[in-house]
Amino acid sequence: MAPAPSPINSQHVAVIGAGAAGLVAARELRREGHTVVVLDREKQVGGLWVYTPETESDELGLDPTRPIVHSSVYKSLRTNLPRECMGYKDFPFVPRGDDPSRDSRRYPSHREVLAYLQDFATEFNIEEMIRFETEVLRVEPVNGKWRVQSKTGGGFSNDEIYDAVVMCCGHFAEPNIAQIPGIESWPGRQTHSHSYRVPDPFKDEVVVVIGNFASGADISRDISKVAKEVHIASRASKSNTFEKRPVPNNNLWMHSEIDTAHEDGTIVFKNGKVVHADTIVHCTGYKYYFPFLETNNYMRVDDNRVEPLYKHIFPPALAPGLSFIGLPAMGLQFYMFEVQSKWVAAVLSGRVTLPSVDEMMDDLKLSYETQEALGIPKRYTHKLGKSQCEYLDWIADLCGFPHVEHWRDQEVTRGYQRLGNQPETFRDEWDDDDLMEEAYEDFARLNLINFHPSRFLESGR
């Protein structure tokens, strides 16, 4: 996989989505010399970070014909990780002290993340490449090129041919629903975190929240402010778990998984506890879903594994004309988007070559066999966990990009440890000022900020 000889080839590329992945993909593709068109159905950049109070009429997302609301952001959402490790490599996510309307907290709100993405788009003139209010209807291979059919908000249709398509459309819109024995006869209401915005609808209810990571931890505590009782069912908990959690209203309990649901409205947990619940909130993640993508049955999503996909990016027989940015689940999301985009851009230009189709398929076969031997379920194929930095550094070496910084890696590790150990307070109480200082000193050394790090470090929480 050595660098290929010149000349550099300029491709006509469609990027699907103008969220955090699509924005940096567009920048990297243009930097590499490609012509780029970004297609996005919304009126502004930001993707899932654009908050809307609207939710889908089908709260479980079971109706394939439903109008889809792509945002999953709830009103009280703050980031799960420190801001300094979230940003792109050369555009740090630092406080904007010159603007009093901005959120300078280390774990800021979703509004601040959106503002950061808007700043990024402005800084690199990305909006000039974007067609807003454009819904992609179909993407398919045609004679070695890619046909993209779309329609605008005004009803105009487009049928265009591109050299390549980069999929940056996210994977937080198709809810994954827990399978519970007896749920079909249970009379209560069910919803998914995708449709959660504010706690008000749960006032005085007994609520069961399934899942206790990130959104589950947040939403259960948000609901506890108004609910009568909140009971969290967690697959990670031992079977006999029954623990009261410290929240102001003293009304939050942690359980093991749900065992059964019953027509009398009761929910039975595997710890033997029984509650009569009004609502179940599924905080159980999302499915990968690409309804407009036609690959002549070459690709599929099987048990939430997108396959075949070399290094989570390239479908071997369709590469490099089709690629995916942002599929792996990891802490360093924006950074990953940037590194993956650099690789895609370099491959499309011919500056970096991919292995042969057979070599990529052999690599995938070995990867899947290793995963199975380790007992890792297929549905976790795109969850990189502790191997995320190894993955990113491997791609970085291909593109001549620096490895993940020590402070960035450790902020993610320690940040998630705090989330698990102190879910009520982790955003405002931390013990890694050394890493934060290292990050800001790094930004200053690279001339990425125009103020001394102490200005923020001494400002407190």
UniProtKB/Swiss-Prot annotation:
Record GO terms (molecular function): 4-methylthiopropyl glucosinolate S-oxygenase activity; 8-methylthiopropyl glucosinolate S-oxygenase activity; flavin adenine dinucleotide binding; N,N-dimethylaniline monooxygenase activity; NADP binding
Keyword flag Oxidoreductase: yes
EC number(s) per entry: 1.14.13.237
Positions of FAD binding: G17, A18, G19, A20, A21, G22
Gene deletion effect: No visible phenotype in leaves or seeds; due to the redundancy with other FMO GS-OXs.
Coiled-coil regions listed in the entry: none
Binding positions (NADP(+)): G211, N212, F213, A214, S215, G216
Function: Catalyzes the conversion of methylthioalkyl glucosinolates of any chain length into methylsulfinylalkyl glucosinolates.
Protein name from the UniProt record: Flavin-containing monooxygenase FMO GS-OX4
Natural source organism: Arabidopsis thaliana (Mouse-ear cress)
Gene name of the record: FMOGS-OX4
